[in-house]
Amino acid sequence: MDPTGIFDLPNTSLIFWEVVTFLILLALLYRYVYPIIRDQIQKRQAQIEQAIEEAEKTRAEARELLEEYRRQIEAARGEARQILDEARRQAKAQRERAREEAREEGDRIIQRAREEISRERDAALREVRREVADMVIMASSRVIGRELDAAEHERLINEALESLEAEVAGGRTA
């Protein structure tokens, strides 16, 4: 007999049957339970892998959409800049046209005013000449005491007008 009691026959048979029972239990578990657990684990692993693949696919699609939206936003900004530039250019052209039209209208008004002034001046000069001629004729008739012929009359009128024009021209330059 073994003093430790490990190799005693009654203990050895108990250990033997415990090992046999354990092996039978393992065989039964391996045969009936393990395949079910393994299948469930594989199914779960496949579901997780599929979920990861779908998440990555969704993430990739989201990135593509984000890039597409960014491109669209940038294109819209570029288009908006073009529209603003075109509007500014058109506004500037419109202002230039309005300035040019105003300048032309001002020039026309000034030209009409100058023409009107010239007509009025010419009319005033004709009136003054006529009145001066009448006064010269009356004055010369009184001084001379007789009627003048047409040539003498014309000469006196021209002298008076030249004298008057010289005075007017002298007054303008002063």
From Swiss-Prot:
Coarse class of the protein's main subcellular location: membrane
Domain of life assignment: Bacteria
Topology class, membrane: Single-pass membrane protein
Entry GO MF terms: proton-transporting ATP synthase activity, rotational mechanism; proton-transporting ATPase activity, rotational mechanism
Localization of this protein: Cell membrane
A cellular component annotation (GO) from this entry: plasma membrane
Coiled-coil segments on the chain, per record: none
Pfam family, one: ATP-synt_B
Gene3D superfamilies hit by this protein: F1F0 ATP synthase subunit B, membrane domain
Cleavable signal peptide: none
Keywords associated with the record: ATP synthesis, Cell membrane, CF(0), Hydrogen ion transport, Ion transport, Membrane, Transmembrane, Transmembrane helix, Transport
TM annotation in the entry: 9-29
Main function: F(1)F(0) ATP synthase produces ATP from ADP in the presence of a proton or sodium gradient. F-type ATPases consist of two structural domains, F(1) containing the extramembraneous catalytic core and F(0) containing the membrane proton channel, linked together by a central stalk and a peripheral stalk. During catalysis, ATP synthesis in the catalytic domain of F(1) is coupled via a rotary mechanism of the central stalk subunits to proton translocation.
PANTHER family given in the database record: ATP SYNTHASE SUBUNIT B, ATP SYNTHASE SUBUNIT B', CHLOROPLASTIC
Record text on subunit structure and interactions: F-type ATPases have 2 components, F(1) - the catalytic core - and F(0) - the membrane proton channel. F(1) has five subunits: alpha(3), beta(3), gamma(1), delta(1), epsilon(1). F(0) has three main subunits: a(1), b(2) and c(10-14). The alpha and beta chains form an alternating ring which encloses part of the gamma chain. F(1) is attached to F(0) by a central stalk formed by the gamma and epsilon chains, while a peripheral stalk is formed by the delta and b chains.
Similarity field: Belongs to the ATPase B chain family.
HAMAP family membership: ATP_synth_b_bprime
This protein's name: ATP synthase subunit b
Organism, scientific name: Rubrobacter xylanophilus (strain DSM 9941 / JCM 11954 / NBRC 16129 / PRD-1)
Gene: atpF
